């Protein structure tokens, strides 16, 4: 009975399968007919339109309809979440046009003209913003094309050909052409202009074969030639009628028309006629990218203390230079940028102004009595590099001819003794007077007591061994000067200090070479070419040979080094130059500093790492921004 029931069940199972297959076949025929009907209705698109979709509810069961609604909701929610996620992950802040920036600068403008600006840092600052140049520095201190779209150098390295950017225009709307470059160089070569660039271009032949091409032909190779192509170009159509002999008096020197990222807006004078503010506006037709910041204002101050007070009061947003010892009080609102700068500070001897300085033994004794590490610790908290010569470590041709920190006051005293400078002990009643150090600011004597009384003075042929040390009125510079005074008076040299305002140092002191010993910094640029600073032809203004150094052998070395692009040959010439300079002691090389720049925290885009001159802090000014806007970026 059981066996029968089992087989009966199996038979029933297969019968049910057969019935299902039969029904499926019938349904298949019906379904095919339905599909054909639907496709015929909806056409080739094979997707129902909105009118047809509303009938879906008539074919769905309640359960199927619920499932469809849930699926549709999940699909919409997922799409929305994915969209929000993509938006958040790809939404970035981009620089936007707008904003204003005001910067405090020490000094005042005089000639905002590329032909004259080399002797005034303020002029160079503004010229960098207003004028375009064939070459410029990028944020890493490398030379890149600016007004030049490209350039070529012939195999002999004597012909440089530049092709100008086709979109370059002057701020007055006129197109910039090769004729403007030709006119600018010919003006430099005209001695009536008295441009400091004359020496560099006096033997250069310049041609403009067409509107966009200009070529320079040198009499012989000049290795640093590309680096001098950073001078600004003047508009011929505005300067061609200006008498070269009176060019320095032209109104265009204070209301310049250039081709750079910013154009002249206006300047503000005080009641005495001194320019206190200089306002620049974004040039919308600038050939390069940017700029973003709408308005720039430079405000001028006589000292860093005044500039810093203006920063703390909110009168300015930044300061063009921040001394090493200074730190902003509110670091949340300020950013300090430190740039590598090829610069050294030295003591330059003007032997013509003080007979005692003509003696090499005196100059060498002063050098041996100079404690560079002590000076760096006192003035900069140790944050400076002691140097021994005019070519800095890491630069082409650097050669350490002697220790950068040699300090031997005992040997210094012996040198002076052997040179006939006799020690004179001051009388007791005159001791106080002998120990007083004289400090002058400008032409005003302030007479202050020295930190230490002179242990003795020195005389030779009834002449006292005394000198005047001139320094700029800035805290760190004054500390250095006072430290030097104490060190030198320790070996019997009487020292008077002359502290001069930064704004007048060029005009009143450097230009007429009105100093005996000058504490001053020199910026040597990317190429270490010492010619502008140590060749005898540069001893007088507008040259930069502040020691008035003259040595025919050195002149020949510097001239030969300029004529070759071979690095090994240049290094050999520079090594011989440094050896001779070390033997002659025309100056005492002290230290090299980084360049610190103070800006507001909301000023972005400053990517500069290396500069060759303080004005190069504006090298990527077109990338700076204050305002931002949100954009999607995939």
Model-flagged regions — what are they?
Residues 128, 231-295, 305, 313, ...:
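Gly/Pro-rich hinge or "lid" segments in bacterial periplasmic/extracellular proteins
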Residues 105-155, 186, 257:
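N-terminal lobe/hinge region of extracytoplasmic solute-binding protein
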Residues 283-329, 485, 494-496:
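Ligand-site clamp/hinge motif
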Residues 277-282, 358-486, 576, 630-631:
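Append "and occasionally in soluble cytosolic enzymes with long acidic Gly/Pro-rich linkers
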Residues 107-124, 147-148, 174, 196, ...:
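A structural "hinge/loop" feature
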Residues 2-38, 369-403, 475-485, 506-634:
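Detector for C-terminal structural segments
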Residues 6-7, 11-45, 149-194, 215, ...:
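Aromatic- and charge-enriched surface segment that lines or borders ligand/interaction sites
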Residues 197-244, 263:
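Surface-exposed binding/hinge segments that line
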């Amino acid at each position: 009975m059981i066996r029968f029931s089992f087989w009966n069940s199996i038979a029933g199972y297969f019968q049910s399968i057969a019935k299902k297959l039969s029904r499926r076949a019938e349904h298949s025929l019906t379904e095919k007919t339905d599909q054909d009907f639907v496709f015929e209705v909806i056409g080739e698109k094979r997707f129902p339109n909105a009118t047809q979709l509303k009938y879906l509810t008539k074919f769905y069961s309640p359960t199927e309809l619920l499932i469809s609604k849930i699926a549709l909701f999940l699909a919409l929610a997922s799409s929305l979440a994915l969209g929000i996620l993509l938006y958040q992950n790809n939404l970035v802040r981009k620089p936007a046009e707008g904003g204003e920036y005001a910067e405090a600068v020490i000094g005042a403008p005089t000639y905002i003209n590329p032909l004259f600006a080399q002797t005034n840092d303020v002029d160079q600052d503004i010229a960098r913003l207003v004028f375009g140049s064939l070459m410029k520095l990028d944020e890493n201190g490398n030379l890149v094309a600016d007004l030049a779209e490209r350039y070529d150098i012939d195999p002999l390295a004597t012909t440089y050909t530049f092709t100008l950017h086709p979109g370059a225009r002057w701020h007055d709307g006129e197109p910039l052409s090769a004729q403007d470059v030709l006119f600018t160089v010919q003006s430099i070569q005209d001695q009536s202009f008295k441009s400091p660039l004359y020496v560099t271009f006096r033997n250069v032949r310049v041609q403009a074969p067409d509107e966009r091409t200009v070529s320079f032909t040198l009499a012989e190779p000049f290795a640093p030639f590309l680096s001098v192509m950073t001078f600004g170009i003047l508009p011929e159509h505005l300067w061609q009628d200006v008498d070269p002999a009176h060019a320095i008096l032209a109104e265009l020197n204070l209301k310049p028309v250039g081709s750079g990222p910013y154009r002249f807006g206006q300047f503000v004078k005080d009641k005495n006629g001194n320019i206190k503010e200089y306002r620049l506006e974004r040039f919308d037709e600038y050939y390069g990218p940017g700029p973003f910041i709408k308005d720039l204002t430079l405000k001028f101050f006589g000292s860093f203390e005044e500039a810093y007070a203006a920063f703390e009061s909110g009168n300015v947003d930044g300061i063009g230079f921040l001394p090493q010892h200074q730190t902003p009080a509110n670091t949340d609102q300020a950013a300090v940028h430190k740039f590598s700068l090829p610069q050294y500070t030295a003591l330059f001897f003007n032997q013509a102004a003080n007979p005692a300085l003509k003696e090499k033994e005196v100059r060498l004794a002063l050098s041996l009595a100079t404690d560079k590490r002590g000076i760096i610790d006192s003035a900069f908290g140790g944050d400076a590099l002691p140097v021994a010569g005019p070519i800095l470590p890491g630069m082409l041709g650097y050669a350490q001819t002697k220790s950068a920190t040699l300090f031997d006051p005992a040997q210094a005293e012996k040198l002076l003794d052997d040179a006939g400078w006799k020690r004179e002990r001051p009388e007791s009643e005159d001791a106080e007077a002998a120990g007083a150090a004289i400090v002058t600011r400008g032409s005003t004597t302030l007479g202050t007591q020295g930190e230490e009384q002179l242990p003795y003075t020195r005389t030779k042929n009834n002449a006292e061994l005394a000198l005047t040390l001139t320094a700029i009125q800035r805290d760190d510079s004054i500390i250095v000067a006072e430290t030097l005074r104490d060190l030198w008076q320790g070996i019997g040299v009487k020292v008077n200090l002359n502290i001069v305002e930064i704004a007048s140092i060029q005009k009143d002191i450097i230009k007429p070479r009105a100093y005996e010993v000058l504490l001053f910094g020199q910026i040597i640029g990317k190429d270490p070419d010492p010619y502008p600073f140590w060749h005898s032809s540069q001893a007088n203004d507008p040259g930069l040979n502040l020691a008035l150094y003259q040595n025919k052998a050195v002149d020949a070395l510097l001239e030969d080094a300029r004529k070759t692009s071979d690095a090994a040959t240049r290094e050999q010439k520079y090594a011989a130059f440094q050896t001779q300079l070390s033997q002659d002691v025309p100056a005492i090389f002290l230290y090299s500093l980084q360049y610190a720049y103070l800006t507001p925290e909301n000023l972005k885009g400053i990517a500069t790492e290396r500069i060759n001159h303080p004005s190069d802090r504006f090298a990527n000014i077109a990338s700076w921004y204050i305002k931002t806007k949100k954009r999607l970026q995939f």
